[in-house]
Amino acid sequence: MKTSRLKVLIPIFALVLCGAVVLFERYGVKYNPSKSTTIDLNKVYTEDVNPEKECMFLFSETEGDEYGQEVETVLEGMKIPFAKYSVEDTTFVEELNQYQTLVFAFQDWTSIDEDLPDIMEWVHAGGSILVTETPYLNEAFQGVSKELGIEGFRGSYVGISGVRFDRECMIGAKAGDVFYFDGEDAEKIEVTLDVELSESTQRYISSENGEYPLLWKNESGNGSVVMMNYSTIARAQRGFFATAYSLLKDACIYPIINGSAFYLDDFPSPVPGGDGAYIERDYGIDIAAFYSTVWWPTVLEWEKKYGIKHTGMIIEVYSDTVEAPFERNKLTTQFVTYGNMLLNSGGELGFHGYNHMPLCVKGTDDDMQFGDYKLWASAQDIQQACSELSQFAENLFPQSVMQVYVPPSNIMAQDGKEALLQACPEIRILASIYLPSEDSPEYLQEFEVEANGIIDTPRITSGSTIDDYQKITELGELNFHYVQSHFMHPDDALDVDRGAELGWKTLSGEFEKYLDWVYSSAPNIRNLTGSGMGLAVQQYDYISMERRMDGNTLNVKLGGFSDEAYFMLRNNGKEIVGTKGCTLEQINAEQYIVHATASELCVIFGE
């Protein structure tokens, strides 16, 4: 998250005179007014389909539903129709034959001890179970452990600090790759049973040292059991849930976003002040010259190398004014120059704020005051400031419609949000953050369309150095939503908390390692602007699905369909011999990206 601090305007002559000329000559990037790049978000969608529920979701009222809610979020995102049952309701097993899959989202199997024989008989007949939490080590669980692929128990619970892939089962991870939850030296989490698997069990993921199995599949009669042998409540886990569920059947298809977006917060803006000691140390130039001759050329190189389309988030002034009147910034040369260069390189502009004060009102949002930021005097003042920003941007970029808004420091209260949308009805997309923070009241989001039509497109990663938690979350998101969303600030190279002491050469090099990983893992992911990401999320969120396996053909009927949609397909064995209504692109041995161009599609498998 952006460090809270006030900023001051510094001279911009070097930025304008030197930077613009250098970039024009070196890259041939024009900075004359751009044609409109506005994306139409007013699509027409077909009626929803209403499929029969395929999954029984089993939870415990005694244990609570916090963990289960994360699993539910994944099933809903995969558009898996499910029905919830409580283990305390002893009649659930009588209805099991109505479903194809069964998800366990609880740990104490004692409550279903008498039902386990019937459940395993259902598995033998062709049902599939996904165990999403490490079970308690008791007689009920141990009594059926052989059916779950467990040969024996070597001990009780053990600690883990990450995951190691035994085979390539997720996009972004090859066999032998290790991903840590919170760093290699972080305290281990005791959430795993020390078990030995049977020889016939398929092992997919182990602990970071390869010692303890974490995800495996065991065939049992005509059915199967997939076990997750670790329990963590975090958004980073969602992609692992999606992967585990997709292993249950011979083939699994679910909708994805298919998009990669990069945001430049505070750009264009007045050139911020800050500690330029490390810039002076490494380059012998001031901050303005660094932005124009080093930082911005690097950004353009990333666009050229990876096909990135940046979305720049405008800040009009760096002031702490939170009460009308709101003065117009008349120093606009750097806005026009860099804004139009960004537009002409295929990017987009959006709103970040009149200034960098989060939209929270004094007296009603006092609990959201953070750092040195001021609270706004009233919702009316927020509305006036947002109107000023809108008029400022329209004057400078008359052919662009600003549809995307990023809250300053990713903080925004409900009354501030309402004032923003009243002042700027052109805003259709809110892009805040996906991962929670312990030290600030951030505006957390899901990838979804709100009831009022506003599209939420959270950012997952940030900065130049991507830590272990961000990376394992992004790994999960490549497999859950097939999405990458990142933001950085021009002044990251000035902030010690964001790695300034390392120097820009090191910071940019570290970030390129992340980019290399993303684009080698997902080479066909769509590079999108902020509004392009909004459209992709809208198309994803509106989709409904009816799946049916007829012999060797997977038939899919879509509702909430416009002109195209994307899906993840996992093929767990058979050869694919044909398709209708869609095209496939293989990512690894088991996973494919499906591009649907019709509301009915099918994937045909060999014998």
Predicted regions, residues:
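C-terminal beta-strand-rich structural cap/linker in extracellular carbohydrate-active enzymes
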Residues: 113-114, 587-607
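Catalytic grooves of carbohydrate-active enzymes
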Residues: 229-232, 251-271, 303, 394-404, ...
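Active-site beta->alpha N-cap acidic-glycine motif
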Residues: 233-241, 248-341, 345
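Metal-dependent polysaccharide deacetylase catalytic core of the NodB/CE4 family, i.e.
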Residues: 54-59, 124-125, 132-148, 304-415, ...
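A glycine-rich, often tryptophan-bearing local segment used as a flexible ligand/cofactor-contacting loop or short
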Residues: 110-180
